[in-house]
Regions:
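Binuclear metal-dependent hydrolase catalytic cores
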Residues: 1-162, 168, 175, 238-260
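Cap/insert and terminal regions of metallo-dependent hydrolase folds
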Residues: 169-258
């Protein structure tokens, strides 16, 4: 299994990275985990979008799904689409089709008639125990964020990757990540910020320290930190994580790949 980072900037694109988007290659499977602002362009440096087998969206904030509109245009209007093209499976929160249609609709008046089902085959993450995608298995667990949000686990031939999506401290993330080879985990802010807070606000994001604590509690083999906003220092968040997690840990970088 191989993870390629399309974008890793937290809460929106930054000057050197798109927002969240991750390509997982496992055997013949090509799976996207999120597709935030700017990440569709990055995807095309690594893969023909027609070769995708599925998309899994952790939640529906724009920095994790805005470029689904671009993927729709590519698949619906490309003049040289494959003759065997089928609807692309999208695993996402239940309201994804309505939310994605709202982002794509030409106007508010046309929202009610905007239909994406000719291009995307939506599957509600809450309704599936495990999804099989071209020889990989995808599982999901609810996590703690202001909107409906999921962490995602991808398994293939004994290798396992867990992606936190966006979450505050959450037992569900620990359980889903238990024993995983790699935890790709958000670390959005420092554990303390003088003058702002002495402890992170609950139910939104993880600090670097909290990301490390979740990795340690789950017993993962390796921690990859992501989703660092441009206004915080990723190196400082990584140092926090390393204080509480004694396994390999690093910050991901756009266009970098990691073997699992």
């Amino acid at each position: 299994m191989r993870l390629t980072v399309l974008g890793c900037s937290g809460s929106g694109p930054g000057p050197t990275s798109p927002a969240s988007g991750y390509l997982v290659s496992a055997g013949s499977a090509r799976l996207l985990l999120d597709l935030g602002n700017g990440s569709f362009g990055a995807l095309q440096r690594h893969l023909d979008p027609w070769e995708l087998d599925a998309v899994a969206l952790s939640h529906l904030h724009p920095d994790h799904c805005a470029d689904v509109s671009s993927l729709l245009v590519h698949r619906r209007y490309h003049p040289y689409s494959p003759t065997d093209a089928v609807r692309l499976p999208v695993y996402a929160p239940a309201e994804a089709m309505q939310r994605l249609a709202a982002a794509y609709a030409p106007s508010a008046a046309e929202l009610a008639t905007t239909d994406l089902s000719d291009t995307f085959d939506l599957h509600d993450l809450a309704a599936i125990d495990a999804a099989e995608v071209a020889g990989t298995t995808v599982r999901a667990a609810r996590v703690d964020h202001p909107c409906t949000a999921y962490a995602l686990r991808v398994e293939h031939e004994g290798a396992s990757l867990v992606y936190s999506g966006d979450t505050g401290p959450c037992p569900g993330l620990v359980e889903l990540a238990r024993g995983a080879d790699v935890l790709l985990c958000e670390a959005t802010w420092p554990h303390t910020v003088p003058g702002l807070y002495t402890a992170p606000p609950p139910g939104i994001h993880l600090s670097g320290r909290q990301a490390g604590e979740h990795a340690a509690a789950a017993g993962v083999g390796r921690l990859l930190l992501t989703h660092v906003p441009v206004w915080f220092d990723g190196a400082a968040l990584l140092a926090e994580a390393r204080e509480v997690f004694d396994g390999p840990a690093e910050l991901v970088a756009p266009d970098a790949s990691y073997d699992i």
